[in-house]
Amino acid sequence: MSSGAGSGTTKGGRGKPKATKSVSRSSKAGLQFPVGRIARFLKAGKYAERVGAGAPVYLSAVLEYLAAEVLELAGNAARDNKKTRIVPRHIQLAVRNDEELSKLLGSVTIANGGVLPNIHQTLLPSKVGKNKGDIGSASQEF
């Protein structure tokens, strides 16, 4: 008697076929973000009467890309501040220092994010020793 390895059934064709393991749509698309949950949100949100099969996959991919981009920049900001944990301040610095993300999230307030450090040029002390340095360097040429 055959073991049924090729036919997908048990006991030589008798009995119930073995159930195949279900594969999520996220893993089929190679994503970490939940495609099924986003599909459920799209259907429940009444954005349209019907939702295509590819729409939640595409939206999941876009959201995953944006999250990865923000997390990479925030991780760099945390490393620059010699920290190992990303806090809202690092996310704020990452978003506001990136031109495209700042434009995308321009009207968004990040809680506990603080503000960007910025001192106006007129408030900074002026360089007085600039002219003396030029004279000194000219005298050194002789």
UniProtKB/Swiss-Prot annotation:
Residues 1-12 have a biased composition (Gly residues). Pfam families: Histone (PF00125), Histone_H2A_C (PF16211). The keyword Cell membrane does not apply. Expressed in meristems and dividing cells. GO terms for molecular function: DNA binding; protein heterodimerization activity; structural constituent of chromatin. PROSITE patterns: HISTONE_H2A (PS00046). It comes from the Eukaryota. Residues 1-28 are annotated as: Disordered. The modification Phosphoserine is found at S139. GO terms for cellular component: nucleolus; nucleosome; nucleus. The keyword DNA-binding applies. A motif ([ST]-Q motif) lies at residues 139-140. It is found in: Nucleus; Chromosome. Phosphorylated to form H2AXS139ph (gamma-H2AX) in response to DNA double strand breaks (DSBs) generated by exogenous genotoxic agents and by stalled replication forks, and may also occur during meiotic recombination events. Phosphorylation can extend up to several thousand nucleosomes from the actual site of the DSB and may mark the surrounding chromatin for recruitment of proteins required for DNA damage signaling and repair. Widespread phosphorylation may also serve to amplify the damage signal or aid repair of persistent lesions. Its main location: nucleus. Keywords: Chromosome, DNA-binding, Nucleosome core, Nucleus, Phosphoprotein. The [ST]-Q motif constitutes a recognition sequence for kinases from the PI3/PI4-kinase family. Belongs to the histone H2A family. Variant histone H2A which replaces conventional H2A in a subset of nucleosomes. Nucleosomes wrap and compact DNA into chromatin, limiting DNA accessibility to the cellular machineries which require DNA as a template. Histones thereby play a central role in transcription regulation, DNA repair, DNA replication and chromosomal stability. DNA accessibility is regulated via a complex set of post-translational modifications of histones, also called histone code, and nucleosome remodeling. The nucleosome is a histone octamer containing two molecules each of H2A, H2B, H3 and H4 assembled in one H3-H4 heterotetramer and two H2A-H2B heterodimers. The octamer wraps approximately 147 bp of DNA. Interacts with numerous proteins required for DNA damage signaling and repair when phosphorylated on Ser-139. This is Probable histone H2AXb. It comes from Arabidopsis thaliana (Mouse-ear cress).
